[in-house]
């Protein structure tokens, strides 16, 4: 298990847990590990980008200094999205890419995530190799001198190459569709107008004026309520909300209903399936996807494959089994036909393309997914794994599952960061879901609760 790396890179409160000193060390260690097998006849190249957080420039300078100190050529992208970095690695044939962002988290946080030469997030073994260098008693990495030091080059045309890529993933423009777009005051803020104007949409924007502190602040994919108002007030056909680094997308239909990642996956999957383009007729989901999605998938002749929470697990399953569509309820949608990581703007464009090609409203496309009421109970416990071998807890779960008789779901899972056990139930009615969740939670509390 990694010490510094979480499910999405290294993350913490900027200037405290994620300090400039740490960024420098990550630049040296990460840069060395990711370029040590590069062609010795040419200087290794690494792309660096950031989102709009106030701490971004501070960490960027330190990170780049670390990279330069091990002889790496840095292409600086400035403010751009995480999926843009992953895409441009391949365009530039770079050894790696690094994004400075804490995604959907508040401005006080920041993070550093690495991508390999293939544009994918790093495997655990590579992260562990970087951590071993960070924890070594002394720094034994190379310290080149003179012409051996790295250099920095600005790469402003990267944004244009990325937006052109997005625009060419659909066969036609999106003229005739009216859309409201929420940029979360993040990385997509400077790209939205260019893309949606080029695609000839009638668009309005909100949360596209970052000031370093307002990223994700009551806006974006984790706070779509403002976008709902914007859609209804403007009479838009739909709304799209991205997160701070642009790898998530949540939509809003013309009636003001929130269309989460589950519904987006269904809409895209159903469209691809009908066109014979959904590989193995399978959508890859995580354990947090609603039972309503699974019922809709099955009712429409498709299948699902399930992974643990985290888009990296979805990507691993897709790569291993040859699937081309997957994602999370939170709005990370991966469409392997075009990209190898979650991309909010790509997802939004594909969703609008389905609307244009079918002539259907977003509410109509999402209607087959009837989301079941869900209740989540977090319980502080003495031992997060004790529930697995506790007979009374297992019996309580079995009893509820038998009562559900296939018309509901129980998911019990430990928190990855806190001494909590999460009990999640889904059922056909609010009354039933409350009853079932409370029933199991009461037994957990009495058996292993603190």
UniProtKB/Swiss-Prot annotation:
Gene: glmM
Entry note: cofactor: Binds 1 Mg(2+) ion per subunit.
GO MF entries: magnesium ion binding; phosphoglucosamine mutase activity; phosphomannomutase activity
Family stated for the protein in its record: Belongs to the phosphohexose mutase family.
HAMAP family xrefs: GlmM_B (MF_01554_B)
Annotated keywords: Isomerase, Magnesium, Metal-binding, Phosphoprotein
PTM statement from Swiss-Prot or TrEMBL: Activated by phosphorylation.
Cofactors required: Mg(2+)
Alphabetical GO biological process terms: carbohydrate metabolic process; peptidoglycan biosynthetic process; UDP-N-acetylglucosamine biosynthetic process
Catalytic machinery residues: 103 (phosphoserine intermediate)
Binding site for Mg(2+): 103, 243, 245, 247
EC code: 5.4.2.10
Protein known as: Phosphoglucosamine mutase
Disulfide bridges in this chain: none
């Amino acid at each position: 298990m990694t010490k510094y790396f979480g499910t999405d890179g290294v993350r913490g409160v900027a200037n405290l847990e994620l300090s400039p000193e740490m960024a420098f060390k990550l630049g040296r260690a990460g840069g060395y590990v990711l370029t040590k097998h590069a062609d010795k006849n040419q200087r290794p190249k690494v792309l660096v980008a950031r989102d709009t957080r106030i701490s971004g420039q501070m960490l960027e300078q330190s990170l780049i200094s670390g990279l330069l100190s091990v002889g790496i050529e840095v292409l600086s992208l400035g403010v751009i999205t995480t999926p843009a970095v992953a895409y441009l690695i391949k365009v530039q044939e770079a050894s790696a890419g690094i994004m400075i962002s804490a995604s959907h988290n508040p401005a006080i946080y920041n993070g550093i995530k690495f991508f390999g030469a293939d544009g994918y997030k790093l495997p655990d073994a590579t992260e562990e190799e970087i951590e071993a260098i960070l924890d070594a008693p002394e720094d034994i990495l190379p310290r080149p001198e003179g012409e051996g030091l790295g250099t920095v080059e600005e790469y402003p045309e990267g944004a244009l190459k990325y937006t052109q890529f997005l625009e060419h993933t659909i066969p036609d423009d999106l003229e005739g569709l009216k859309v409201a777009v929420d940029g979360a005051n993040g990385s997509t803020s400077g790209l939205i107008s260019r893309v949606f104007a080029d695609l000839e949409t009638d668009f309005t924007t909100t949360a596209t004026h970052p000031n370093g502190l307002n990223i994700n602040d009551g806006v974006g994919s984790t706070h779509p309520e403002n976008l709902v108002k914007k859609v209804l007030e403007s009479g838009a056909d739909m709304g799209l909300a991205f997160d701070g680094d642009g790898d998530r997308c949540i939509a809003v239909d013309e009636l003001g209903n929130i269309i989460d990642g589950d519904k987006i996956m269904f809409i895209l999957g159903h469209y691809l399936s009908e066109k014979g383009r959904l590989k193995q007729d399978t959508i890859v989901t995580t354990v947090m996807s609603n039972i309503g999605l699974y019922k809709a998938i099955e009712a429409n002749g498709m299948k699902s494959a399930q992974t643990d929470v985290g888009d990296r697990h979805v990507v691993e399953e897709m790569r291993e089994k040859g699937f081309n569509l997957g994602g999370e309820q939170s709005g990370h949608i991966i469409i392997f036909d075009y990209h190898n990581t979650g991309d909010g703007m790509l997802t939004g464009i594909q969703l609008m393309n389905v609307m244009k090609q079918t002539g259907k409203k977003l509410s109509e496309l999402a209607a087959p997914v009837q989301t079941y009421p869900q209740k989540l109970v977090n319980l502080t416990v003495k031992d997060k794994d004790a529930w697995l071998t506790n007979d009374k807890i297992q019996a309580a779960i079995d009893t509820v599952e038998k009562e559900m008789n296939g018309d509901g779901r129980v998911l019990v899972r430990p928190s990855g960061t806190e001494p909590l056990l999460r009990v999640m139930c889904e059922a056909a009615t609010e009354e039933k879901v409350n009853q079932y969740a409370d029933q199991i939670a009461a037994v957990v509390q009495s058996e292993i609760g603190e």
